[in-house]
Amino acid sequence: MSVHVLSVEVSVIKQFYALTKPRVIQLIVFCALIGMVLAVPGLPTWAELQLALLACLGIWLVAGAAAAFNCVVEKSIDAKMKRTAWRPTARGELADWQTLLFSAVLCAAGSILLYFWVNPLTMWLTFATFIGYAVVYTVILKPLTPQNIVIGGASGAMPPVLGWAAMAGDVGPEALILFLIIFLWTPPHFWALALYRVEDYRKSGLPMLPVTHGNEFTRLMVLLYTFILFAACLMPYVYGMSSWLYLIAAVVLNLGFCLYAFYLWRDYSDLLARKTFRFSLIHLSLLFAALLLDHYLL
């Protein structure tokens, strides 16, 4: 095999890998892992570790399938936006049939793995999440309503529920609390992004909130949602899922998020919107990391 042929094959593999939106999937699997950990009291057994690994792989495959499907549907939109113009589908480097076939293979492989080696409930919940994101959100909600992020956020909030179901075989109230936290976190996270990327969204024709309702209204919504999110993030402590370690982390992180949102509402700048968006990622990651530490240390 020539060096040129090998180089082309590696390039194609990288293109298919990019379709799965690796950074997004890392956060999805991390959130699913939190659900798995909290569903198991104490340290997991070797069998439980194996089950968790299989569940993570299955969820990763189906989530990657949903991301690839999204790339096909939104290729013309992606091509108009600086943030997404690099995607292989937007650049025309991969044909639609190739991407759809790739998506179907990933979805089938992940679903089979979850059904036979984890449990049927997790498979059906994961497949429902695939439909929720790939079809309900991407095809129906996103191009039609500025509330796309709010309603469509349900599919993005599912990972801890999937993780819990994988280990416990059911969906407990603890999993629903984690779902609620991510569900309420999603709008201010994406609206902060949309604020400083508003021209991209305007060119794309997507009815994001800053485009349809303006900058000032969107900033107010970001602020209000961070207040509601603050209350939701206290629920693991109130319900008895965690102790003082998580409580302290939740209070500090949510105060930080609320402060960013307040300053953004009071005196807007693209730089501050970008910082708010980045902090939202830190917020969720550290919040769940604190929940994980609390579970094992206290």
UniProtKB/Swiss-Prot annotation:
GO molecular function, one term: protoheme IX farnesyltransferase activity
PROSITE patterns linked: UBIA (PS00943)
GO CC term, one of those recorded: plasma membrane
Enzyme Commission numbers on file: 2.5.1.141
Organism superkingdom: Bacteria
Catalyses which reaction(s): heme b + (2E,6E)-farnesyl diphosphate + H2O = Fe(II)-heme o + diphosphate
Location(s) in or outside the cell: Cell inner membrane
Record InterPro entries: Protohaem_IX_farnesylTrfase, UbiA_prenyltransferase, UbiA_prenylTrfase_CS, UbiA_sf
An annotated GO BP: heme O biosynthetic process
Job of this protein: Converts heme B (protoheme IX) to heme O by substitution of the vinyl group on carbon 2 of heme B porphyrin ring with a hydroxyethyl farnesyl side group.
NCBIfam families per record: cyoE_ctaB, PRK04375.1-2
Note: Carbon 2 of the heme B porphyrin ring is defined according to the Fischer nomenclature.
Protein name in UniProt: Protoheme IX farnesyltransferase
Lineage, top ranks: Bacteria, Pseudomonadati, Pseudomonadota, Betaproteobacteria, Burkholderiales
